[in-house]
């Protein structure tokens, strides 16, 4: 009985999720609300991998980084140059 209830709840949740995501606002992001803005952006990043924030490059050891936070060092430590 518990398993049946869990399956029914899961099916209802997935049906509602599909309905929310398939409302057509992907073509009009100006009317997207809430989570839809996030997911439409994620879809665009999947189509254009260069737009993804995960593809940011890091500066190697010894590269100029200026002040901490201006340039991402691969090691994560910056003091004028990227430290090992």
From Swiss-Prot:
Keywords, comma-separated and alphabetical: Cleavage on pair of basic residues, Disulfide bond, Ion channel impairing toxin, Knottin, Neurotoxin, Secreted, Signal, Toxin, Voltage-gated sodium channel impairing toxin
Tagged with keyword Signal: yes
Disulfide bonds: 58-74, 65-78, 73-82
The keyword Secreted appears for this protein: yes
Entry-linked InterPro entries: Conotoxin
Main location: secreted
Signal peptide residue numbers: 1-22
Pfam families: Conotoxin (PF02950)
Role summary: This toxin activates voltage-gated sodium channels. It shifts the voltage-dependence of activation to more hyperpolarized potentials but has only little effect on channel inactivation. It is active on Nav1.3/SCN3A (EC(50)=3.98 nM), Nav1.4/SCN4A (EC(50)=4.99 nM), Nav1.6/SCN8A (EC(50)=1.27 nM) and Nav1.7/SCN9A (EC(50)=2.42 nM) voltage-gated sodium channels. In vivo, it induces nocifensive or pain-like behaviors in mice when injected intraplantarly.
Domain notes: The cysteine framework is VI/VII (C-C-CC-C-C). The presence of a 'disulfide through disulfide knot' structurally defines this protein as a knottin.
Name of the featured protein: Delta-conotoxin-like Bt6.4
Record organism: Conus betulinus (Beech cone)
């Amino acid at each position: 009985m518990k398993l049946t209830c869990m399956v029914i709840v899961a099916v209802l949740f997935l049906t509602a999720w599909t309905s929310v995501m398939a409302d057509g606002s992907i073509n009009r992001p100006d009317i997207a609300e809430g989570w839809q803005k996030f997911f439409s952006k994620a879809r665009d990043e999947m189509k254009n991998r260069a737009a993804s924030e995960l593809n940011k490059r890091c500066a190697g050891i010894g590269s100029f980084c200026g002040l901490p936070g201006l340039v991402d060092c691969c090691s994560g430590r910056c003091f004028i140059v990227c430290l090992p």
